[in-house]
Amino acid sequence: MSEFPECLLIVTVEVDPAVEDEWNRWYDTVHLPDALKCPGVRRGRRYVSSGEISETVNGQTQKSARRIYTTVYELDHPGATATAEFQTMRGWYHFTPHVRSRTQVIVPAG
């Protein structure tokens, strides 16, 4: 296994504060452990924003105090997210009305 992963899966989520505690319990005790059992997933770690968030769109900067959660998974290959195990594990459907998310696989640029 090389020092650097072949690719990354980045999951960024904003959670409605009304379900944030429930979301965190579920993510930490069910979702993340299940994800780490999937073939091709080396490891993963969750992060949460600290302090004010600054976003710039079309030259306009906005600041916000909302929390953003980011999970970084190291994958053996981009197809790791297409396995049956990964597709079964994905489901956070019961939280769908309460989250805004972005998921993307990142591969080496060069």
Task: Describe each PLM feature range.
Residues 1-110:
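Macromolecular interaction modules
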